[in-house]
Amino acid sequence: YVNAAKNADATEADADVVIQVAVPAQTTVELCSNEAQAILSKENCIAIFGSNQTAAEGVLAANANLNVLGSDAGAGDVIGVGFDAGSIIKAAVQDGTFIGAVTQSPLMMGYYAIYALTAAANGQELEDVPTDGYWYDSTNMDSEEIAPNLYD
């Protein structure tokens, strides 16, 4: 840890793992790609996560230039994971560029949105509503639980 953690005197060079977060000024695929290229170009980068559809597509765009993503970490591949289920992300999961991704349930998100709107219209107090996320990879994309949640 560094900065207000276990060893505040530690440096990045002392760390076994460095978690780097990059947020572009605007959320476009191009700007996310620039940030992802900077991370993927680092020596010893072992994994990258695109935290939404635009960021995940940015990671894939960066990989088009660098060709470092894959599923064999032992062979030096950088492990890529995305969040969402657009056609570009699904194709990357299918072909092994991403090892998988997390998707949401659009049906349940819509259900809870209507539930919350109705409650608000009736003057009821609203609370946070948790929504499920589902891991998918090339082995379960066609399953009954996952397939309905893989939207474009």
Identify the residue ranges that each predicted region occupies.
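Hinge/beta->alpha junction and helix N-cap segments in small-molecule ligand-binding domains
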Residues: Y1-N34, G50-A55, V81-G86, T103-Y112, ...
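A generic structural signal for alpha->beta connector loops
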Residues: D14-V17, A75-D77, F98
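Flexible loop/hinge segments that line or gate small-molecule binding clefts
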Residues: G86-Q94, F98-I99, T139, E145-A147
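Sec-exported extracytoplasmic/periplasmic mature domains
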Residues: V2-A10, Q37-N44, Q53, L60-V68, ...
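Alpha-helical scaffold segments in soluble metabolic enzymes
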Residues: G58, A92, Y112, A116
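Hinge/cleft segment of the Venus flytrap/periplasmic-binding protein
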Residues: N3-N7, S105-D152
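Hydrophobic alpha-helical
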Residues: P24-A91
